[in-house]
Amino acid sequence: MQETGQGYANLDDAVQSIRMGTATILIAPGVYRQCTVQAGGNITFKAVQPGTAIFDGEACEGKAVFVLRGLSSVVDGIVFRNIRVPDGNGAGIRTEMGNLTVRNSMFLDSQEGILGGQPTGQKIVIERSTFAGLGTCDDATDCAHSIYLANQGSVTITRSRFERGRGGHYVKLRVPNLSITDNSFDDSAGRKTNYMIDLSEGGTGLIARNTFADGPNKENWTGFIVVAAEGRTYSSAGLKVVGNVATLPPNFGHSPAFVANVGSDRIDIGANKLAPGIRAFEQR
């Protein structure tokens, strides 16, 4: 515990000691087969050295390594890998309550990276993190995704990398406000993947300065960014898509839409650098 200097044998003991307080838990280098449930307070989970605190294979409540339902949570420098649970939604992080910031972290070879849904004005920020080998449509009744988040607040994803998807979408959001900027989506080694970004129920904000490289082994190749495919809960008016780069694999043989809109709100599509064969817009 950074504030007190007290050490704990396992992570959950440290978390439970905080109760409704505020604390930073410093996690020493190592491979941990542990998980924890945060039920209150404001907790920062921080690796002493980024990338050296590795949580491998253990999920609490059949959900995730970190099940977060406190006042707020920060996850900094942690690696989550090999998370699988019977319902197909095994995640590094399950956010159920409270604002969440994730930075400098890695989510590897699991059913899901970050999963959460709550009917509040929650703010989620994900930055400088890696999502690889995630997603499945084989283990779950519904597909699992690298990131799958729903709230009535906002989601920001920036300076992060998505690669080697194993099913589902790379980013699936059901939120009114979003910012997805300066990320890399590399599907070249993906398999059974779908959209890069699925804004299932609409939403507005900014998608800018991302690089998208489509791969040859997609389950659904028809769009990179798809808006309101499942409903029009949130307005997409003014959603700005600008300054992105998108490419196709050699001899792809398909012509996907860069942005496909199932809703009726006007999306603001600016200048994007699209490889031959990619259609800028499709109204569905």
Can you describe what each PLM-predicted range is?
Residues 1-28, 33:
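Acidic Gly/Asp/Thr-rich repetitive segments characteristic of extracellular carbohydrate-active
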Residues 28, 42, 46-53, 71-82, ...:
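Right-handed parallel beta-helix
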Residues 16, 20, 32-46, 54-76, ...:
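Extracellular beta-strand-rich solenoid/capping regions of secreted or surface-exposed proteins
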Residues 6, 67-70, 94, 202, ...:
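Extracytoplasmic/periplasmic, Sec-exported soluble proteins
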Residues 253-284:
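Leucine-rich solenoid repeat scaffolds
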Residues 57-66, 86-94, 109-118, 138-150, ...:
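Extracellular beta-strand/beta-solenoid scaffold signature
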